[in-house]
Amino acid sequence: MFSVSSAPVLRPSKVSIFSVSACQIICDGSQINWGEGKINCDERQINWGEGKIDVIPSQKPAIINLFENRFSHRPPFEFVLHLRGNFERIRALKDLLKKYEERAPEIVFEWNDLETEARGWVVINSLRGGAAGGGTRMRVGLDRNEVISLAKTMEIKFTVSGPAIGGAKSGIDFDPKDPRKKGVLERWYKAVSPLLKNYYGTGGDMNVDEIHEVIPITESFGIWHPQEGIVHGHFDPTDAEKIRKIGQLRNGVSKVLEDPNYCPDGPTKYRVADMVTGFGVSESVKHFYSIFKNESLQGKRIIVQGWGNVASAAAMELAHAGAKIVGIIDKNGGLINEAGYGLEEVKNLFINHKVGNTLEIDGMLSFDEVNASIWDVKADVFIPAAASRLVSANQLQRLVNAGLKTIASGANVPFADKEIFYGPIMSQADDQLSLIPDFIANCGMARVFAFLMSYEDRDLTDEAIFSDTSRTIYNALKKVHDKNSSLTNVSNTAFQLALEELLANPKLQKTN
């Protein structure tokens, strides 16, 4: 029973005492009225009598929207308790993130090229399990702190993809369009080859190609495969086991796909590395709908950001599952089709209108045109799979207002937050809809590396590789669902599970 009190007091420990007449919530001039008491929401806190919740200014629009859409016809105490619980979850996560971010990386290797202005860093956040892994990227302006944050991100991803190793990253501050790039990479990999031989595994990343640059250059310095350090440091194999594992890595990543279930028909040959990350993003959506909603993707409306390998492969796999692609926004332009593109149309876009990593088709909208309207298109699922830190708070809110229910992060850190992991825009998304985090949704390639290192059967099939990636993503989402079965705060829960594992077990033993 709820009693009427003359004092407008909302006590979270005794929710039966509150005023039911004439309340209002005040957010810096924006008022939502529901009765006689109020909740003050200034730039620092929400007060509800005996307690308070810290609030940052950028969260206020989301709080107002949340009330208007979900709580305007419900008792005031429910809204307060929701805010309280949500902010307490965020506070708990931020405490874990603070501990994780403040832990200094175990190894930082700094390199200065004697022939150019290039500088580079290998950051190994930890040698958890005897080794660490993370790709090599190159861009102008890259710095040590960026590489540290990426190494920490990789360590979180390995809690899902495996193996149970530390996170690492290589970064080179140099213009990838400079004709001296090849020489810079050759001198870089010569300098870091002792790490790659013993306990560090790398691969391609931004502006560094795995097949055409990383593999041939590292081979010239006696590295059997860019992941050799993980094989040696984590698995501690015999000579015969090492040869077999590295052989599987060589063959598996560059394997030409033959099964039509995992690649489109046509003259172009696609490799595992071309398709598996986008496939994993699609599987994360499919498994999420199955586990959390007991629904299929039939008829679901999808918006995709980007048209590189990840975005285009994800779109095609989602269409294969029965979804409709209603919008594509790429850096040069895009398409909007309210009726939705089906499988054959998406295949055509994938095969015939993907030039490099961009969409090119006659009659497509300019970037300004598509950017002005795509965020208001009705959709069930959004796949940000272009560059990092692109999605703004305004774009997110427009998607939500148009009915968006789910986001699967094909890109690493897709939101335009300055924070490494869980900034205010990501937090807003996580509270308003179902947000599948990047370290689950886009873990496909990392999982393939782990699978190839541990797989015992020499006959590697397309189905074996891709079904393992699918199963890994399913298990990660099931673990999240077991702790939090609601449709919101999915990323918060996933982060807490990963960070609790890393902070509790910073040093795992090698795998024998």
Language-model-detected regions and their locations in the chain:
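Long, intrinsically disordered low-complexity tandem-repeat segments
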Residues: 25-27, 31-53
